[in-house]
Structures are given as structure tokens and as C-alpha cells.
Amino acid sequence: MKNGESMQDVKSANLELFYDCIDESNNILYEALHKNYFELIELTVNNILAADVICDVDDEVAEKLNKEYDKIANIDFTVEDVRKAMQAIILKGFKELRIPNGNTTPDTLGIFIAYLISKLVKEKSLSLMDPLCGTGNMLHTIINHLDKDCQAFACDNDLWMTKLTTMVSNLLGTPVEVYLQDCLTLNQKNLDCIVFDMPNTVKEDNKEYFPYKAILHFSEMLKENGSMIGIVNNDFFDYDKNQEFKKALLKDCSIIGLVELPDSLFVSKPKVILVIQKKIYEDKKNCFMVKLPSFTNVKEFNSSLMEIEAWFEKNKI
């Protein structure tokens, strides 16, 4: 580290270095192969993982690529450097391909969910699944901020989302078993924890509201005392006119927390975090209900955390 250079500066520089390497590799490959941006990311990641140019390009292009890869060959990147750089690259891909990405989960929420998991799961290891994983960024954020050994699973019904999740997982050296399928057809059992960011869903007449159907299905995948932490729209319960969803959920589960999130985090509807445990409490514990301030308001945010800490201490979850 140079004189006057902070650890934060080094981390930021490493993140930029990794991003620039991927980006320049994609540019070189585009000039040679004219593939779409996600395909370019896949080729670049495969080259980096192989520590060699394994895609079909001529020697001149291979030499240019190797010069880029040499820039990162001996750098000790943190998992967060790699994750953040890849998330920025993937977001650029969404923009290049003109794909809406309004449901991208802010990193701060992944970190906050990791905190909630640490309060709910005391064991040193756990099985963890995101059945609506998208690019996998929220899942990887959670894993990176959990001081636990994770057996991780992910699912999405979009081929490229599963590919991107797998690519990032491989770069991070974090094993994640990824499924390409409808989340309602998953048959995992005895999971310790399920996390998700529910996509914005319009309620269709005479059809069951997808988030209700999904959450009831996910609850069947949890082990006894397992937990589910999901981000949902704040009007989530408004569609449960006859309380049918709530009655079905509460047969085997308890809602133990509801966290209202800052509006500034989302470009569309405001959202909340729903915390569910697959356990029925005889004393019918009240759930914790917290309205989070902006994450940049450290004093008020810490006050909200103290409320949650006090609830867990009182209720011995």
C-alpha cells in the first residue's frame, strides 16, 4: 500500500480494475465476434476461470485478451470486489440489451437480510435458497456477509439469469446449485432459510395472486423452525380479501417481523421485508414492526436495529 493510501482506496481501485478488465475484454470480443453483451460476459468469464483464452478467436485477438487478463492475474480481489464489479457489468448488459432491470435489489438490503438471518439461525452452517434469484446478486451479497458455511441454491425461469448467477458464483468461488425452472415446481425440502425479492405482480381477476401462491409453496420447502425472509410490495396483504392466504400460511408458520423500507430505495412501489418462521408459538408472540430510515442516516438506522435486537432478546427466537 502506498503512503497516504487507505484500505478503502485499495478496495475501490481493485473493484475498478476488475470491472475494467471484464469491460475491455467484452469490447475486444465484440469487435471480433459481434455477439450480444451477455454472451460476451460468458466468454470473458470462461476465459478468466480457465486462465487462458479458450474462445474461438485468432492469435491477435487472443494476445489482446491475455494482456487484459494479465492485469488482474496476481491481484488478491475480495469477494465483494468481484461481486460489485460483476453487478456493474451485468447492469451495463441490461442497458446494452435494453432489458428493464427495475427489480434489482439494492446491496444494502442483501446486507440487512444477512443480519436478520444471523439473528434467526444460530448454527454455523445452513442451507439457503433464493427461488427468484434473477442475476443472483442478492443471494451472493447475503452469502458474502454471513459468517456461516452456506449450502446455497438458486432458481430462475430465465436461462440468462441462471447463467449469470452461475458465472458470478464461479468467479467468487462460492458453490451455488442453480436451477432453471418455474419456482412453483421446486421440490426442495428441509431448507434452513429461503430469501427472495418478489417481482412486482399485477393481480389478475379470478386468478390466485402469484406472491401468495409462491410463499405458500416456499413454506413447504422449509424445515421445522426454518425461516423465510422476503421483500414484497407494501400493499402485499391488500389482495387477501377473505384472509385465505393468511389462514393457510398461519397453519404451519408465524409472521415474526415486518420491516417497512425507505421509499428512496425503489424506483417503483415502496416495499417491506416480511419475516416468516415455520413454527407455531403457543404464546402467540407479537411480530417486530420497524420502519427503517434511510441507510445513510446512521443514528436513526442504529436505533431501528436496537429495536430489532431488543425484540429478539425478549422473545428468545
Ranges and model annotations:
Residues E123-G134:
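Conserved class I S-adenosyl-L-methionine
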